């Protein structure tokens, strides 16, 4: 079959992906081989493929494909996350477009809409990953709300509750007024904002004077129940034991004392609003202050405030400023910059709010999860993230796990008619416990009321490495014993606490061991200007359009060339173009080599070609060792670059040029076979990075058995490397490059044969056949002294010379070299001037001084060589 002149990914990618699926090459079942397991960070069902997914899943696929070729039983488990807040928001918006409000529906009616939306959209991103070449075991596709995962979540909730680690209580939480739910601390993003500091006058009861308070939130004065001063603050001693009147509101509140108050902030007087500030809440608890909740769940003012009822909180801030000023109770305002908490999900300002919620105690779980990372039982790549992890774990707070949403795992708590509640996985178990607790055998299920809230989405995904193998429902089953702990986790550092830390906690709590052995943290994908990719900036390309334009292999290569481990990626379409060009280079090299097949003859093995195939075979062995080492350190970008250079610079530019038969001449069968074998080994090394083109060409190389695939071919062990032989060949390459440079400088055509003189002894005599062919030499001669007028160069300590005879215009060459000599002498003077400057030598870094000294040595060497060459030419 004749290959097309140009590689067309569209002809190849769909064909081979379907072939891999048809032959179950992604599938995995427990057997006697060493397992290699990766669980996909489950993308949200609301999601479509973006550049972050592309990077993360390209890396996972590279690791999985490499493991298969190492003979491991590779299992990459895909799945999606139900994403409570994001999905519920999508469904609410869809219903709103149809004129339906969530509040008009029952829970069951709403969930029918949510499931329908999920069924329609939930699999989109996984289908898109196939375009990338992701070799997931699709038969194992899971969903965080499927039956097994849901049962696992409920069992863990009940277990942790029974262990005393889950409790219910009124606490200050982060409230999202748009999503109408509590958030964990980790779901709050703090942004720096330029606002105002308002100085408010609180009249001292029974006196004419005022106490002035500085606040960023004047709209919360309706919830003030105290003023607090620092007992050590000399400027506010006169307020001790007094009472003040809340401006506009008229409420009389006490002045309390606590050294928590910062004397330097504002006036040193603090308004205390226990229902709407975390620190004020703690003061309220300490001094038994009343708590007035002035906000409705949607961020409007509640009836409890007594004024501005129903207005939005930010509208009230504007209005209350005017009202305070009109009443003479606003002393002044100042520009002020502070950090404001935003909901990660809805991007609205969160509201600290007292709320009845469910919490998970974290101290015990954090203790068991910290040491394995700090001791490198679980390795982080890059290791710098260990410090981030430790900081989180040592400053951990209890996890608010309840959400005021319907889409998600409903909390398995059931309230009793007379108060109190029971916790159980099923209705039947709950009823049994309720009858026992109340002593009433006649209780019916309809007498119980299940908690309306659902669990934080992360409460299901923290069990992911265990629940995927059904380890919660069926402890010790064959799959959990075989696949767990998993091998590598590839994820972003932004969810190191949300997900990575919590999976480690769950792993040790429920399996008694780590959930994964290594964590590879990817960087953030940025554009070439260093900006984070986002829809609003319009700088985030559509991954599917990139694949259509450059091919999946081209895009994968572009991503990986710009992806140093753990550092941010500066992505540029030009890198995908480079990847596509590399595909064409591979394609054309294959066409060239296969084109020799019809011209094979029974000629003797050419000495130059024999040396070349021996050399490249050893280069492949050496490269295989280097690539394995880079994979072990997760330096995948460097591994790809090494293979790229091996193919482009050494296979194409050297091996093929040496073994290529002259036009119209046959190729030796042994040389052809060795070249094909080298090509096949290169395809195997490249396959994890570029699976489609490598599979296509591997199948074309020779006849294959039905169902055979490069992706399951063993890489094999590299052979012994003769370092001396490799070094001699490298020296030969340097000689060839130097002779070619002389031809270029002297404008001597390659068809004109030259002689090469070796002064003293030839250190690479064994390589003469290669040097002779690649330089078109009539002779290689060992001499005591080079010929007059010869152009020379040094390789190591050996001098080589090319006698030029009548091939050049001597006068013109002398003039050219004298001009170069003048330039180099001027350059040297500049370097020497810098090195003679004591200030420079005493203050510059050692590396900079060393670089200048190297410039001096190099310039002096070139000047000496030029002077000798000029003198030699003048003797001609």
Curated annotation (Swiss-Prot):
| Gene Ontology cellular component terms for the protein in this record | cytosol
- UniProt KW Cytoplasm keyword: yes
Subunit structure comment from the entry: Monomer.
Q: Give one GO term, molecular function aspect.
A: ATP binding
Query: Which keywords are on file for this protein?
Result: Aminoacyl-tRNA synthetase, ATP-binding, Coiled coil, Cytoplasm, Ligase, Nucleotide-binding, Protein biosynthesis
So which domain of life are we looking at? Bacteria
- Major enzyme class: ligase
> What is the annotated role of this protein in its UniProt record?
Catalyzes the attachment of valine to tRNA(Val). As ValRS can inadvertently accommodate and process structurally similar amino acids such as threonine, to avoid such errors, it has a 'posttransfer' editing activity that hydrolyzes mischarged Thr-tRNA(Val) in a tRNA-dependent manner.
Listed InterPro entries: aa-tRNA-synth_I_CS, aa-tRNA-synth_Ia, Anticodon_Ia_Val, M/V/L/I-tRNA-synth_anticd-bd, Rossmann-like_a/b/a_fold, tRNA-bd_arm, tRNAsynth_Ia_anticodon-bd, Val-tRNA_synth_C_sf
Give the matching SUPFAM superfamilies.
Anticodon-binding domain of a subclass of class I aminoacyl-tRNA synthetases, Nucleotidylyl transferase, tRNA-binding arm, ValRS/IleRS/LeuRS editing domain
The protein's matches in Gene3D superfamilies, at most eight in alphabetical order, are given as: HUPs, Isoleucyl-tRNA Synthetase, Domain 1, Valyl-tRNA synthetase, C-terminal domain, Valyl/Leucyl/Isoleucyl-tRNA synthetase, editing domain
Q: Which residues bind ATP?
A: 535
Enzyme Commission code: 6.1.1.9
Pfam entry (one): tRNA-synt_1
Q: What is known of its domains?
A: ValRS has two distinct active sites: one for aminoacylation and one for editing. The misactivated threonine is translocated from the active site to the editing site.
Give the gene that encodes this protein. valS
What compartments host this protein? Cytoplasm
Major location, coarse class?
cytoplasm
Q: Which reaction is catalysed here?
A: tRNA(Val) + L-valine + ATP = L-valyl-tRNA(Val) + AMP + diphosphate
In Swiss-Prot or TrEMBL terms, this protein is called Valine--tRNA ligase
Source organism lineage?
Answer: Bacteria, Pseudomonadati, Bacteroidota, Bacteroidia, Bacteroidales
Motif ('HIGH' region) positions are 43-53
**Record-level GO BP terms:** valyl-tRNA aminoacylation
Q: Which PANTHER family match?
A: VALINE--TRNA LIGASE (PTHR11946:SF109), VALYL-TRNA SYNTHETASES (PTHR11946)
The source organism is Bacteroides fragilis (strain ATCC 25285 / DSM 2151 / CCUG 4856 / JCM 11019 / LMG 10263 / NCTC 9343 / Onslow / VPI 2553 / EN-2)
- Identify its protein family: Belongs to the class-I aminoacyl-tRNA synthetase family. ValS type 1 subfamily.
Q: Which NCBIfam families match?
A: PRK05729.1, valS
Which residues fall in a coiled-coil region? 805-826, 853-875
Please tell me which stretches of this chain the record labels as motif 'KMSKS' region.
Answer: 532-536
